């Protein structure tokens, strides 16, 4: 192997267009694959092809490092990768942060060597690729005879690097004046200045390598030996093991030498999901990592260095380097560069890389703590599964676990039921929730599930909450602020991203309430809350804004005064339970901690699940004999029928691929994965003759009714003296004005219908209207109807009616209860006055705005239907009024809801709920409509009634017409075939 090139960090193809550099690969004009060059020595041909593949790992690596350089450049830094990468690309945050840490670790080692006193410092980069470490440090330290950088790699690659330096005035100035070719003693030296040497050499030929070093006066006899630091950043691992070890041993034999080795490790073995994915990635590229299997861990690397002659050795994982050797100010700088929430993937990556330093003790050696308790075993079964979701939320539900959202191939908004009962069905109406992950699900009462928060990206967090009940998701009270990575048990929520109030309690009728806690938990992001009961549990782990892990365990007690009391629990082996993103349950009288990630330990099959014995302060390993090695990050854990169900989970394993964990159930039970099924519209063929009473509520529960979009009747409310004063026609005529002109619906029948227009609009004086109603009421045989729905008196064609403005003489008599008025606030759109004769039915219709109907005098029957039944109740396309003549006698498959309103009763009617009214007596009522969506969501045309459909629906209808027009000219049956297919596709959206 001729030289060594630092690694390829990505699986994407590396070629000339990506790096902008001439590649040393020789190509077949008909193929992108490297040509197996026919050498005179056929035995060398295969090795040469492998060498080409190893050289190819450089291109993508430097594209990633260039991405880091552009984004993470500090104030006085120069951009050196730009000379080698002509077409920069922005990598993902996890790739950027991973490479930043690698570069920072290698820079730390170089700085440590330069800080040692020595007559001269020589920094030798083995497998340098296009790394610009010489330029960076020469820019920092300047040209000096006491500092030399030596870059070593394949001849073709080094020639490109030298040519690039020579073309750049900036780089030429940094490295200094070149020696004339005639003065260079060895042709392997492609470039030499007083501070820089570019060298191509076969590192297996150590005798030749040493000869070159001596010719360059890099090795001298006596006491004036320079300090030589050899660096190898994911490079010598591509050499055959014996050759790599010989190189390390030769370096150790040199006086005053150091070695900084950064390469992969597999501390949890080859079967760990991340390790397995990583090794498969490099094998697929035919760039096998030869060192990692013989030296899989930091202790193994220690032994390697010691056996090869290094008297002092220190080393840590890159996770420990980030945790302990990256200063807080640098961490803060990195945090502010780009949004980031891939901590599980980041720590998995860092735990699979080590930085080993031979020749000096520059790292405080860290030993992972493993408890020496005997582990106990739980039985486990694995289902066949399609439940591959990363960052999904889950909770117990029915006979299993409901799994919502998360990342599969795409981010999901749907749910799955992982059931222990093979006969279960999972019928859930389509929801309009935004796809999300890292939210919470909690069963707040049997069969009722609360979804809270989450995010789509680290910068887009959600505050919306939803309740699943009877197969229907409904919105409920929003969180006080958006949050994700929180934990929730029952109705108790803790922590999450940038949460002002750490502890919240949820009530279905009152919403979220902040709980008091005298102790501010320092690491609330991705912490673990395990509740033994609704008022007792433990809290541990998590992370703060600087990336520090919580290393304490606290008992949690909820007092009667709605105060959270935290008390420190003395525990041993903090490295075992100091975790981010772990899940926990109380099962079999045990606190179980499952999965998560840490800086100090890459959790394996023996310690990724532990029992926390809070009485003795011990952690006890729990063996779960999974059929395959699960990756217990971004997962969920729940108890169902005394069985432990582990669901979801997995990670994007840096650039090496994606690993998904299959669900597991502990307890020898089979688990069935059931996808969401929509309620079938076709089954609604039988007549539904049942009528359900509208739910009653208290004024305190009005906000809950609103956020849950639940029709609710509020009885006997204080609406002012109007319910008494407005009984008198004389009072009304006196205070409105007998000659005030109003527009009235007049009909010779009792069933008014907007579609058939079986009424007329007549302008009457108010006194005439009241006389007409009196006459109708006096004649029990009369079939006439009179109905006033007030309009604006000043601008009836352009303004919505306002009770206070249009009827100031009586408006003072009426008031909304304070609870409602305060909640609605200044969003009121219209307040129409309604006066009608008895039995005057108003047609079935819907309003796009929420409203409350306040009954002032008389009584009124109201019939309502859920918005989803609009397809069954005679609504023409683009119309908000039904064609059904009399909905009160109409036979339908839709479920009806009814209520009879009396004076002082107030009915909340959510947007889009279909409703019709039938006064039982002469009736007066007041509506209050308010707009609760952004203004641009409503129709752009004038809408004084508030019943114009939303702008998106109007736009959608135009789009449908355009789609239908595309099928013009096709036979009718073919057109119908495809339009029906499109209609079905719309239903699934």
Swiss-Prot record:
Catalytic function, reaction form: 7-[(3S)-3-amino-3-carboxypropyl]wyosine(37) in tRNA(Phe) + S-adenosyl-L-methionine = 7-[(3S)-(3-amino-3-methoxycarbonyl)propyl]wyosine(37) in tRNA(Phe) + S-adenosyl-L-homocysteine; 7-[(3S)-(3-amino-3-methoxycarbonyl)propyl]wyosine(37) in tRNA(Phe) + S-adenosyl-L-methionine + CO2 = wybutosine(37) in tRNA(Phe) + S-adenosyl-L-homocysteine + 2 H(+)
Swiss-Prot/TrEMBL keywords: Methyltransferase, S-adenosyl-L-methionine, Transferase, tRNA processing
Enzyme Commission code: 2.1.1.290, 2.3.1.231
Family (UniProt): Belongs to the methyltransferase superfamily. LCMT family.
Protein name: tRNA wybutosine-synthesizing protein 4
Top-level lineage group: Eukaryota
A Pfam family: LCM
The keyword Ligase is assigned to this record: no
GO molecular function: tRNA methyltransferase activity
UniProt function note: Probable S-adenosyl-L-methionine-dependent methyltransferase that acts as a component of the wybutosine biosynthesis pathway. Wybutosine is a hyper modified guanosine with a tricyclic base found at the 3'-position adjacent to the anticodon of eukaryotic phenylalanine tRNA. May methylate the carboxyl group of leucine residues to form alpha-leucine ester residues.
Residues in JmjC domain copies: 805-947
Enzyme class of the recorded protein, top EC level: transferase
Annotated Polar residues bias: 12-22
Protein's pathway: tRNA modification; wybutosine-tRNA(Phe) biosynthesis
Region (Disordered): 1-42
GO biological process assignments: tRNA methylation; wybutosine biosynthetic process
